[in-house]
Structures are given as structure tokens and as C-alpha cells.
Amino acid sequence: FGSGGVFRITMQNLNDRLASYLDKVRALEQANGELEVKIRDWYQKIVLQIDNARTKFETEQALRVLDELTLARKNHEEEISALRADTERQNQEYQQLMDIKLEQEIATYR
């Protein structure tokens, strides 16, 4: 072979190894790109899940507040109804007393 043949074989060997390394680098870069896409997709999915959980929590809170307000409104309506009934009763008593007073005044003048 001679020194030129050994040099050429060594260079060919180094070129083959370099080509192999470059192929590995390209494959790793491609795999890295695919992983980045998967990570980005996973992150977006998690963000959506968090947003959905937040929305669900806020909706549940709003429904709780709505239930509390509905109950409070019902209680107020019952109180108003009781007050109306009491007012009507007092009005009737007042009217009866006024009728009695009127009858007494008429009786006084007879």
C-alpha cells in the first residue's frame, strides 16, 4: 500500500465516521424537533385543561352564589308575604276600631 494508501484509508475511515456522526446529528435534530412539537402540544393541552378547570371552578362558584341569592330572594319574598299579611291584619283591626269609634260617636249624639 505505501504511506499514501494508508493515509487514504485513514482519511476514508475518518470521512465515514464523520458522515455517520453527521447522520446521527441530523437524526437527533429531527427527533429533537419532534419532541419540541410534542412538548408544545402537551403544554397547550395542559394550558387548556387548566383553563377548563378554572372555568369549571368559576362556574361552580357562580352557581353557588346564584343558589345563595335565590335562597335569600325566596326568604325575602316569604318575609314580604308575611309582612303583607300582617299589614292586612293590622289594617282590618284598624278598620274595625274605626267602625267601633264611629258607632260610639253616633251613639253619643243620639
UniProtKB/Swiss-Prot annotation:
Cited Gene3D superfamilies: 1.20.5.170
Cleaved signal peptide residues: none
Keyword Acetylation: no
A GO molecular function held by the record: structural molecule activity
Phosphoserine: residues bearing it: S3
Phosphoprotein in keyword set: yes
Residue numbers spanned by region Necessary for interaction with PNN: 85-110
Domain comment, as recorded: This keratin differs from all other IF proteins in lacking the C-terminal tail domain.
Function of the molecule: Involved in the organization of myofibers. Together with KRT8, helps to link the contractile apparatus to dystrophin at the costameres of striated muscle.
Membership in a protein family: Belongs to the intermediate filament family.
Official protein name in the record: Keratin, type I cytoskeletal 19
Natural source organism: Mesocricetus auratus (Golden hamster)
